[in-house]
Curated annotation (Swiss-Prot):
Function: Part of the ABC transporter complex ThiBPQ involved in thiamine import. Responsible for energy coupling to the transport system.
Organism: Photobacterium profundum (strain SS9)
Catalyzed reactions: thiamine(out) + ATP + H2O = thiamine(in) + ADP + phosphate + H(+)
PROSITE patterns reported for this sequence: ABC_TRANSPORTER_1, ABC_TRANSPORTER_2, THIQ
GO cellular component: plasma membrane
Ranges of residues in domain ABC transporter: 2-239
The protein, known as: Thiamine import ATP-binding protein ThiQ
A Pfam family assignment: ABC_tran
ATP-binding is among the record's keywords: yes
Length: 241
């Protein structure tokens, strides 16, 4: 379970010569083990900043973050029990698919026989086991994201953060990747927080949905209820109803 308790951060952006623009963010959220939560909202609302605070890339000004009962607010990003997948796959171009996945286990690729076998299994689960000897430049965009997903999964962390990793893929492939994440998350009982600008994608994969507006979670609940029967006026306007 992940719990955000008044996780706050004030972001100041230098605007024109007359003033600076600021956004005061404050997040409260409880996600149970195995929840897949879609984070929706307008650009600049604070969705990516929320994931950055959870991942440790952005230091909160105050508040607490617990994962499975452990306080991780001050932990270094590398020590946090989570994985994160971005729109950019971040594969190393000079390493093979096998090696890129292996980085999820050991940054120096010092792997045991069992760990090497685990890499093959992870590659098979996401459908790239035929390409283990290839370099990223020899893969399609969808295949690269599958490799990046395998690298996340092999770490076997209880929390997976997705920052629109499939938004650049064509609709059919994006749907396939979302179903893959949903299947694996259920199988491993992984908690997933996923940023998306597509209500349809949220409905396909998530059981809960958080609408973020002006740095706060304005609406939170079951996805079908939040998106199918919206009652909040700001959310209704965002959805275009």
């Amino acid at each position: 379970m992940i719990q955000l308790d008044k996780l706050n951060h004030c972001y100041t952006h230098q605007g024109n010569a007359s003033h600076n623009e600021s956004l005061s963010m404050s997040f409260d959220l409880i996600a149970k083990k195995g929840d897949i939560i879609a984070l929706i909202g307008p650009s600049g609302a604070g969705k990516s900043s929320l994931l950055a605070m959870i991942a440790g890339f952005l230091k909160p000004d105050s508040g607490e973050l617990h994962l499975n009962g452990e306080l991780i607010t001050t932990q270094a990003p590398a020590n946090r029990p989570l994985s994160m997948l971005f729109q950019e796959h971040n594969l190393f171009p000079h390493l093979t698919v096998f090696e890129n996945i292996g980085l999820g286990i050991h940054p120096g690729l010092k792997l045991s026989r069992q760990e090497k076998e685990d890499i093959v299994v992870a590659a098979a689960r996401v459908g790239v086991n035929k390409y283990l000897d290839r370099l990223p430049e020899q893969l399609s965009g969808g295949q690269k994201q599958r490799v990046a997903l395998a690298r996340c999964l092999i770490r076997q962390r209880p929390l997976l953060l997705l920052d629109e990793p499939f938004s650049a893929l064509d609709p059919a492939l994006r749907k396939e990747m979302l179903e893959l994440v949903k299947h694996i998350a259920r199988e491993q009982k992984t908690t997933v927080l996923m940023i998306t600008h597509s209500p349809d994608d949220a409905l396909k994969i998530s059981n809960k949905c958080a609408f973020i507006h002006n740095g706060k979670i304005r609406v939170f609940g079951p996805t079908q209820q939040v998106l199918g029967e919206p009652k909040d006026e700001v959310l209704i306007q965002y959805l275009g109803f």
